[in-house]
Each structure stands twice: as structure tokens, then as C-alpha cells.
């Protein structure tokens, strides 16, 4: 019997220890005579009162691989939790997954608390003058709360998992150690439904079959149970990607049967309330794109809520959501401390506005502008913003436009800029705009900005941004056009692109890298999430640098 999903494999008993030879005849009676009573123990002063031998020095039992993997003497090892520092050999830092090697999800199975790239990251920040770099290892197993899984195989033996490295062969991963336990339980239920109802998994070569993919998204938002129980009792939003144009297609009857099976066995009336809601997505394309454009809500609650950074956030199945809920909350908690109270904030590449809304609620900002190119994020933003306190006193807007088109429009009037770009990093136009907000070029930017205001009506990108804008709070705030960003907060999921962008920003002498933190968003991989804080060089500092340069030239 296999171990329950999400748990370590049961150790197999050693047969050599359990098996003893059976004698053909009883041993001679002389060997079974009771031995004589042992003599009394020696006097206490001979042994008992002697002090026990001192324990071996700690240096003789170093945690295996801890010091070689951690950078020395950077601060990267300092913030690691005490249990990691003292018990690095503990199995808690090992993957212990039966699927490792077949599944492409994890690239290493030991030292999950120290991604291989960590030493390079710590060295980079040390070279650039960051003395308080920290690394948050987070939860090392059962951390993934969102998963997109391919479905292949046969009704009798469905394969639900990820593609093997470099192929389109699906590795079945029913006991994935990264998945939240509720995801593994929901996958098990789905597998049972596929077999019992004879659902045909998708055949990628022939383009036939019925069920192509499934997305599992866990919500831990449940105010009816204690806070410390909410994560482990998370419920799953199930999104089935069906190989048809819509719910009126020929095979739609099977889809309805599968949905009823899942809801009956995992819904609120089942013995274990596992499933939060069920959605269907209809996709007939032969490309590698997972989702089609048509979504249908079929069972359960329509809105999936999660608590991020102190605010309630609504996420549709088509919205982007962080896979590691706990680590993302840790990042938001750290980020908010770097936003001065009363700031005017612009959040570029904002998605559904999670970061902007969190900052608005926790830092009493005067205004927050969220800029996002994906129009599908608008509905999630509106729902989330509707739950903010009514007395917030902050003007919050969401703009559906491309931040890379004349980004100076968004930088002007903002004291804090937050950027959370995709893995490729910042657009060149955004980097250029951030470089040019140095104090020496304020006048040029003021003139350009004033000209832009006169030509608003002739610039369709501004009109589109205004039409798509969402205004949450009409509190009047006088934003001075004299304000330019003093703080830049950069969140990065791509280390190589961040290094390039960071060097571009600090080489211009307009920005100084002051703080940096890393988060273990994807244990078992070589990925790392970066939170970096840049400060614009002060006017006094800039003048001092120029004087020193002139003096050196003389």
C-alpha cells in the first residue's frame, strides 16, 4: 500500500533483521541454565560519580554540505532558520520524492533550503555594497498552491502530471512533494472519475480525446476555521480544459458527468469538502497554448479569494497567481516596510494589482496607480478593491495600457515606483526613463511632460489608458508635478535579467542599490525571487560627486 499523498515514503522493514533460523531441535539443556546472579555494581566512587565524557566539539560534526553550499562570509547564511543551521543533514531539506528524475518540475533533491544560485546572488549583492542581504527559505515541501497539469494516457491508466524534460511525454506525479496536499487529493479524485466515466485523455498527435489539461488552484481563505488550520485545509478550484468549442459540443455530456462526479465526491456535501469550485475552459487549438478564450463557471463559488499582504484578493482562473502563497506573503510583508507612509506610488506590470492594493492599505498612501497590459486582470482588480476599507483616503486607479510606451507619464508625480516585470526583465524604454529621472535632468523632463499634457487628445495610448482606467476612491489629492521617484522597488523572478537591469540602473549614477532580499519561491529548482530596493542619489550627493570628479580632473 503506497503512502498517503504528500507524505514521506514509509520505510521498508529489513528482512534480514526479522528472519531468524529455526533450530531443528531445542538447544542442550545446559545452555539454558539460568546464569548466576551478577555481582553488585562497583562502589559509586569508582564509576558512577565520574563526569560523563565531554561531547565532541560542534566542529567535529558539521552539517553535511551546509558550509560548502552557503556563501561565506556573506549574510546569506545568517537569516536561515535555526533548525536549518543546526540540522542541515535533516531530511526536511531533502526532496524525498518518488518522481524525481522523471518529472521536470524539480532539478535537485538535496539542500532545498539553498538553491544553487544562492551563492552567486549573495556575492553579487556584497560586491555592490549591500551589507544586510537576507534569504528566506520558506516552506520546503507542500508549498505549491497552483499547478497546471497535462492529461494523457488512457481512461484505464490516465497520466496526470508534467512533461518529461525535453519531451511531450507526461510523467504521472500522484505523490508530488511540492504540491499542496489538497492538489494531490483532487488529482486522485479526478483520476478516479476519468476511469469510471471512460473519459478519453487528449491525444496530442492525433488531436483527439476529451480532457486536455487541468489547473488546480488552492485557496486558504476560510474565516470559519482557526488561522493555523487554514493552510492545511485549503480547498481547490478545479479548471478542466475540454477539447471542444463550447458546452454545446457533441462530447459535452461527458463533461457534465465528470463535473457531477467531482462535486458529489469532493463538494460541500461529501465526507471531505475538498473542492472549492469547478470551471471549464474550451480549447481546440493544436498549439501548445493551454487555455482557450472561453471560460464557464459550473459549480461552487464563483470567486476564489486569498489573503495577500493584508488585503483580500480575488483571482479568476485566467488570472496570474503566485504558486507559493506563503513565500509571496513574506515578500509583501518585507516590501511594504520600504514604502514611506503617505507616498504616491506607481505599480508597473501590476497584474491584478495585488502589490499596489497591499501597499495602499498598509502604508496610507496618497495615491496608487496600477499599470497592466492584460485587460483580463481588470475584473479581479475591481473585486479586490471593493473590499478595501471605505476610509482609506487613497486614490487608487488601474490602467490597461503598456507601461513601456512613454513611461515618463507614469513616473511623473510618483515618489515610489514598484516594478514586477516578467522573467525577461524591464523593457528598455522603462530602464531609460528610470535612468533619466536623475536630478540633473528634471527640467528637461518637466518640459517634456508639460508638452505631453497639451497633446493628450492626439495620443491614442493616453485615451485608451483613460478609458480602461478603474477609479476606486475619489478622495481629492493634489499630486505635484514636481514629484519624481525617490525609491525604486524591483521584484524579479529572473536572476539573469535582474543582474543586467541592476547594472544598467546603477551605472547611470542615478540610482543606488541599498537593500536586497531573496525568497525561495520554488524549492527544488535553481530559481530565486529577488526584492531589491534602489534609492535615487540625492542632490547633495550628486553635487559632491561632480565636485570630486572635477577636482580629480585638475
What are these regions (language model features)?
Residues 1-24, 36, 44:
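N-terminal chloroplast transit peptides
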Residues 8, 82-84, 225-227, 246-554:
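Rossmann-like S-adenosyl-L-methionine
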Residues 22-28, 36-43, 50-58, 63:
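Intrinsically disordered, low-complexity proline-rich regions
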Residues 78-119, 141-142:
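Cysteine-cluster motifs in flexible loop/terminal segments that predominantly coordinate metals
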Residues 130-154, 211, 219-220:
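Composition-driven low-complexity segments enriched in polar/acidic and proline residues
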Residues 152, 216, 223-243, 312-316:
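Short, aliphatic-rich beta-strand segments
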Residues 157-161:
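Short aromatic-glycine-enriched beta-strand elements
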Residues 169-222, 242-286:
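Internal alpha/beta scaffold segment
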